[in-house]
Structures are given as structure tokens and as C-alpha cells.
Amino acid sequence: MKDRKRYLLILGIVFIILILFVVFSSQIFPHGNQLHMAESLEAPSGEHFFGTDNLGRDLLERTFNGLKISLALALIIQLISLAAGAVIGSVAGYFGGIADKLYVMVQNVLMSFPSIIASLCLIAMLGTGIRTLIIALSLLGWVTYARLVRSEVLIIKESDFIMGTKSIGASNGYILVKHVLPNVVRPVIPMFTLMIGHTVLAISGLGFLGFGIQPPTPEIGMMIKDGVTYITRAPWMILFPGTLLSVYVLWINLLGDELREWFSPIEEINMNE
């Protein structure tokens, strides 16, 4: 247990440092979008650690600025998805009946399509842009939380303390807010963390396909797409943004996995009680 605490603490500290570096990237690197055509496709050097792109822009600056935008969007998307999924999953799991059947039907429809294809279809209908990206990924993301919350609520609502609360005349709304939702928080936290990394990759994938954040706003997927054209002349245009993206997503996933392991024993104890 002590080793797990130490490992989780290290993961958390490094994660916070990485996030702070991204958050303040605009102050650290304030000129990421400035064009310097005379310096285009320069190899990594002391002046440009990641080299420059085809327009002479510093790749280190653009990569960190792009990561900041992707992480901010991922956080917004997951907060919206979590709020919607928690409400829908709680109502479906607690009340059952028509609400639950309707939820299951919608869930089956949404999950029958690959998420990337569904996202492309929504963006094709709504148009590209940051707002559309948030709408499209949120409309698809809530199902993950709703399914998790519903499964937890189905178990919790049959517990003795919920039955006892009902017997003293407590309203369904009170029970949901006071007793059910607080007991769903633990499994949701690691899921939320893992989905942040998943969403960052989804944003980058859509950007690579040309359906994500549009230029001149820096975005990792679009930067990698631009680098494909110059892969033989300037491989650093793909190597450094792709590597940094992988490192951030890997660290988020490691933190999410460790949080899931951390909360699992607590969940088992609570259920046994």
C-alpha cells in the first residue's frame, strides 16, 4: 500500500508539472505562430530545440501551445459528458422502466458506430471549428459515463441503507443527490482521467484528418499532417509533436490506471458493508 501511495504521488506530481508547463506555454513561448520564412525547415538546434516547420515557426512553441488547446478542450468535453452521463445514468438506473429502456436503446445506437466515424459525420453536418468539436465529442462521450453510473446505481439502490432511507419517507430526489451520486464518484474519477487522454487523441486524430481545429491555431494532429508532406526533408515535424503527444497521453493513462487500482479496494469494502 505504501509503494502504491508513493507511485501515485510521483505520478501526480509529474502530471501537475506537465500540466503547468502546458498551461503557461503562452507565457513561456509567446511567439509560436510568427512566420519566419527565411528559417523554414530548420533542423533542431540550440535556437529551435524542435526545429521549425515549413513556415519557419518554432515547433517547440507550437507543440506546447497545441497541447494546451487540446487538453483544455478535452477537459471541457469530458466535464460536459460527465454531467450529462451522470444525470442520464442515475435516472435510468434508479427509476428503471421506460427511462431505462429508452437509455439502453440510445446507448446501443450510439455504440453501434465507431466513435471516429460518428464524429466525422456530426462534424460534416455541423461544420468544422472548436464549438463543433466540443458538441460532437460531447454528444458521443456521455454514454461512457452513463453506462458506468447506471451500473453502479443499479447495485447501490438495492443496498440496505437505501432501503432504510426509503422506509422513512425520503424523496427519490433526496436519495439520489444525498446517497446515490456520492457513492458513484469513486469509479467515475479514474474513468474521467482516462477519458481525458482518449479525448486528446480523438482531437488530434480529427485534426490530422482535417476535421478538427483549423489553422492558424496550433493543433498536434494538424501539425503531424503538415509534417507528412516533408517527412523526408524534415522528419522532426512529425517526430517531436508525435512523441510529446504520446508522452502526455501515456502519463494521463498511467495516472488513470493507478487511480482505478487505488479506488477499487475502497469500492469492494463499501459493497461488502
Residue ranges with predicted function:
Residues 1, 34-77, 226-242:
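Periplasmic/extracellular loop-to-transmembrane helix junction in inner-membrane transport proteins
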Residues 1-30, 106, 185:
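N-terminal signal-anchor/first transmembrane alpha helix
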Residues 26-27, 74-107, 120:
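Transmembrane-helix boundary motif in ABC transporter permease subunits
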Residues 49, 53, 59, 93-94, ...:
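Generic hydrophobic transmembrane alpha-helix motif, especially the helices
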Residues 52-57, 94-95, 110, 164-183, ...:
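Short helix-to-coil transition segments within interhelical loops
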Residues 78-79, 86, 90, 128-178, ...:
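Membrane-cytosol interface at the C-terminal ends of specific transmembrane alpha-helices
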Residues 123-125, 152-153, 202-244:
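Glycine-rich helix-loop "coupling/hinge" segments at transmembrane-helix boundaries
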Residues 140, 186, 192-196, 235-273:
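C-terminal transmembrane helix and the adjacent membrane-cytosol boundary/short C-terminal tail
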